[in-house]
């Protein structure tokens, strides 16, 4: 046998011994344990509406392994938001976020599969200066009119090394919902119209508008309601942008502008014209109640977030806030005895902007045209921003007691419970 032949024989012998040793290892007590392919993030709904929860778990970890789980997203300006927590896997190497709380109670204290979603804060950009200030701010992804979904990325890492990642799609609009931009020049109103597919079961149409922030802040809620089957419109009534034809102050804003929008909405496919509801937040709660009281033939139900029970003065100049057919609406308590349906007032007991909890109680003490009482729900530790939907609005605000973190967490809980009540009323 030549030199090359001897080398080949020696290598073959070594490989045979290695294979025998490996076979011997597999016959030991660990041979029956399946080999893990590595960490993996498991979710029950990779694509879900932005107001729907997702069950998140991680598998393929080592027994009792400590890892960091994080959520990441970008806002409409491309600035990153995120939240992360340290978690410990169980004896089987599994981690279920609905059963495990982050170590040290940060960024939230109790097991919650959606905890990282709602705990996100700005990671860079001007928003970081707002954290802990007590000033209100929240996450705004691209407008539903521009982008029907946004991405939320989950990652698992250990000591800075990424072990797993998964991107979830959070939907504002389902594929069968149609959108149309409304302008004062063409439609005599400024807003976004969302309609379900033709032939859909008729449901209550919903007209949504915000408060003193101006603009079209109700567009995310309107889009989600459309995804739930309701024809909706998010209406801008002031601060609608250059060239919009709308004023820049709450000054003689006429209820007929809102009823014009409501009449257009009532005619849409899938709309039950007898059941139209209006949804207003903060200063918008005033006009929502006025519409229910003064125009019951158009409006049935009213959802009033962080409400006032009275008409207040103008905002950013002027003489009176609201008008009806060109006539000023006087300041003072808003009667609700002509409302055809129900006023649902949703408030926070720690509201530093105004006494929305007291107003909610006053609203619930009043009765509609049939003699039935209106309703209210107050969340004692929540602040002014109890409005709209859960999960998709991380952010912060300070409460009347000065607390920021606890108020913001209470806001998130209020949105989850309050949104379910709103959907039930509308259905």
Where are these regions (language model features)?
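Bacterial signal peptide processing site
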Residues: 21-26
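Mobile cap/lid helix-loop segments that gate and shape the active-site cleft of serine hydrolases
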Residues: 294-295, 299-335, 397
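Short beta-strand/loop motif that positions the catalytic acidic residue
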Residues: 338-340, 345-351
């Amino acid at each position: 046998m030549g030199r090359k032949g001897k080398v080949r024989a020696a290598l073959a012998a070594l490989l045979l011994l290695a294979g025998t040793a490996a076979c011997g290892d597999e016959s030991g007590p660990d041979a029956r344990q399946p080999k893990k392919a590595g960490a993996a993030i498991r979710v029950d709904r990779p694509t879900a509406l932005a107001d729907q929860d997702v069950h998140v778990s991680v598998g393929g970890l080592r027994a009792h392994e400590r890892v960091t789980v994080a959520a990441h997203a970008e806002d409409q300006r491309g600035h990153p938001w995120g939240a992360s927590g340290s978690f410990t896997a169980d004896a089987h190497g599994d981690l279920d976020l609905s059963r495990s709380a982050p170590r040290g109670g940060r960024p939230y204290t109790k097991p919650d599969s959606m905890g990282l979603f709602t705990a996100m804060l700005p990671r860079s950009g001007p928003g970081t200066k707002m954290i802990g200030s007590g000033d209100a701010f929240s996450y705004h992804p691209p407008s539903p009119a521009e982008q029907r979904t946004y991405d939320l990325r989950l990652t698992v890492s250990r000591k800075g090394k990424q072990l797993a990642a998964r991107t979830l799609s959070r939907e504002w609009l389902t594929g069968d919902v149609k959108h149309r931009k409304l302008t004062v020049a063409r439609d005599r109103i400024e807003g976004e119209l969302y309609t379900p597919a033709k032939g859909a079961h008729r449901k209550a149409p919903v007209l949504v508008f915000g408060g003193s922030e101006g603009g079209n802040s109700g567009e995310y809620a309107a889009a989600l309601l459309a995804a739930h089957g309701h024809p909706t419109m998010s209406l801008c009534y002031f601060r609608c942008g250059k060239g919009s034809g709308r004023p820049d102050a709450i000054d003689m804003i006429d209820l007929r502008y809102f009823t014009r929008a409501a009449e257009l909405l009532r005619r849409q496919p899938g709309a039950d014209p007898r059941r139209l509801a209006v949804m207003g937040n903060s200063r918008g709660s005033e006009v929502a109640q006025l519409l229910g009281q003064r125009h019951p033939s158009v409006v049935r139900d009213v959802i009033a977030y962080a409400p006032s029970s009275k008409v207040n003065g103008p905002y950013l100049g002027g003489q009176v806030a609201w008008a009806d057919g060109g006539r000023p609406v006087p300041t003072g308590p808003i009667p609700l005895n002509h409302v055809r349906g129900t006023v649902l007032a949703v408030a926070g007991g720690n509201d530093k902007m105004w006494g929305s909890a007291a107003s909610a109680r006053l609203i619930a003490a009043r009765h509609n045209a049939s003699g039935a009482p209106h309703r209210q729900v107050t969340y004692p530790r929540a602040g002014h921003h109890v409005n709209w939907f859960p999960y998709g609005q991380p952010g912060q605000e300070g409460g009347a007691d000065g607390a920021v973190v606890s108020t913001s967490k209470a806001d998130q809980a209020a949105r989850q419970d309050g949104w379910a009540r709103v959907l039930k009323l509308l259905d």
